[in-house]
Amino acid sequence: MTLEITGSELIKSKLIDAPERSGVYRMFDVNKQVLYVGKAKNLKKRLTNYIKSNLDNKTLRMIANTCFLEYSITNSEVEALLLEAQLIKKFQPKFNILLKDCKSFPFIKLRLDHDFPQLLKYRGKTLSDGKFFGPFASSVEVNTTLTELQKIFKLRSCTDNYFNSRTRPCLQYEIKRCYAPCVGKINKEDYRDLVTQVKDFLQGRTKELQENLSRKMEELSSQMRFEEAAEIRDRIKALSYVQLKAGVSDVVKDADIIAIVEKNGHYCVEVFLYRAGQACGNIPYFPTATENSTKEEVLEYFLLQFYQKQHVPAAIIINHEINDKENVIEAIKKINNILQINITVPNKGGKAKLVQNAETHALFSLEQYLKKFAKNQEIMFEIKELFGLSEIPERIEIYDNSHIQGKFAVGVMVVAGKVGFDKKEYRVFNVHTPSLVCHSRESGDPKRLMDSCFRGNGIKNCGGDIKGDDYEMLRQVLTRRLTRLRQEPHKLPSLMIIDGGKGHLGVVKEVMDKFEMNIPFVCMSKGVDRNAGFEQFHVIGKEVFTLDKNLPVMKYLQILRDEAHNFAIKNHRLGRSRAIKISRLDDIEGVGETRKKALLHYFGSYKAVCDATIYELAKVNGINKLLAEMIFNVLHRKN
């Protein structure tokens, strides 16, 4: 494709017809990938800035790569802000300020559609039916709170299916984490009273709750019901301890405390969550920013991107003013369909102290981040020199596979970046092995073999022996990966590392040639006796070489390889475990679909079936003692 004009000349040509109105513009590279999305109060004036002479290096690189430019007119600046935020979220342009790793925060959910409501963790922006408490800064925070609540209030956490299948109390009852409503150990009225207490606690009404419990304890004592009174006493003590440990603020009720700091062109935004006056944890973010970005700009973009995924509290308290605060407030209100929010920068008092605390945490988080970043950059430079790369790698993809003689085969990809592993980019490839030449040890019947490949376990793996064809598995994984990279060229890796040797090198070259791609790659194989520290590296056009096992770059490459290896084994075992759970019951003579369903319904889960005694198995409808013994023996046979 031949382009007539690009870069600044393209922008000059677009200026002729550019309107003096608010809107959003988009810059594209030669592959029509979005490089940058920007908003403007006046599109003509904003685009004019890109043909001036005092631009920073990153902006100059962006303009040089711009081959297409489009703009959209909006009715207001708020609309422009909204559209810009939506497009940045959708396209993740490389030259924009980006907020990465922004998962939605978890909540505690109390279901209200059951006679005995369930307490569970919930993640997602759309809050379905039920009562929600939070958000919490991390799964650790919410899991810890749930554990404490179960110790104190003993509400059920099981699913409805498990609840309905119980004929005896489960382990949670035995360890005093549940009152076992499933088998009538507590009535509806008493359980509802506990639900009300949980609501009061999570909504911050701890003083009223403790007063009510104290009155109830005295009442029970006066009635000589000392055991029940002692239980209430222990609950009051536990509530006091949890409240003290969680940290309670009398300064804010529902608020996000947000502080931004900068050092050497890197930014950290620390967010503290307060709900119902209780601290719900904190989390640091490290948005990527351009060279000439300011704190005001980074914080503005952070707020717009952050509150596209997170729930908005009544108050947002920040440590730095933003330029376009009123429009940002209006945009956040429209994004979340709410009527009122308040963004403030306190100068004194309790709120200012909370902001100062968040800023102190942000500085510490940024220093730790920069240490990790600097160390990683040193290693990345050594990798660049070692493998003759044109630039310091920003994204390294590492590939491995796992199987047992071709069964339950999976390939995996793990990703390492500027500051370590990027786990949200990890991928698992379920390898479809029936296309290979298979030899079943149990039967030469092709139909039976294909049936075993796709037996209703949801795992598309061959039940026969495919001779462990690593090359074909790698070919499939890379074919699927490169197909995806054609659609996502902005995710092209700087380097691919494949766990394998000379033969794998040829497969990678074959697939690369087929896709006409030129991504640098290297194969890393075990050395003598497959001992760590003697790894061999295979690169096209070079002799096989090894590295001193004490070199930092060698240790780093081993860490990359081991991460991929462990991720592959983990996912292989998951697949194998799912298949074994089903097939073990399927393989027992006399246990068909009806009896299998009866077993699972009676015990509630496959694990519970395995834990059952012969006597307990024989209590299931349709299972006699002889069959119970057979089931028990098969389930307790070693793999």
UniProtKB/Swiss-Prot annotation:
Highest taxon of source: Bacteria
Gene Ontology annotations of biological process type: nucleotide-excision repair; SOS response
Domain UVR: 207-242
Domain GIY-YIG: 20-97
Record-linked InterPro entries: GIY-YIG_endonuc, GIY-YIG_endonuc_sf, GIY-YIG_UvrC_Cho, RuvA_2-like, UVR_dom, UVR_dom_sf, UvrABC_protein_C, UvrC
Single GO term (MF): excinuclease ABC activity
UniProt-annotated location(s): Cytoplasm
A GO CC term assigned to this protein in UniProt: cytoplasm
Keywords, ordered alphabetically: Cytoplasm, DNA damage, DNA excision, DNA repair, Excision nuclease, SOS response
HAMAP family: UvrC (MF_00203)
Family affiliation: Belongs to the UvrC family.
Function: The UvrABC repair system catalyzes the recognition and processing of DNA lesions. UvrC both incises the 5' and 3' sides of the lesion. The N-terminal half is responsible for the 3' incision and the C-terminal half is responsible for the 5' incision.
Complexes and interactors: Interacts with UvrB in an incision complex.
Official protein name in the record: UvrABC system protein C
Lineage: Bacteria, Pseudomonadati, Pseudomonadota, Alphaproteobacteria, Rickettsiales
Gene: uvrC
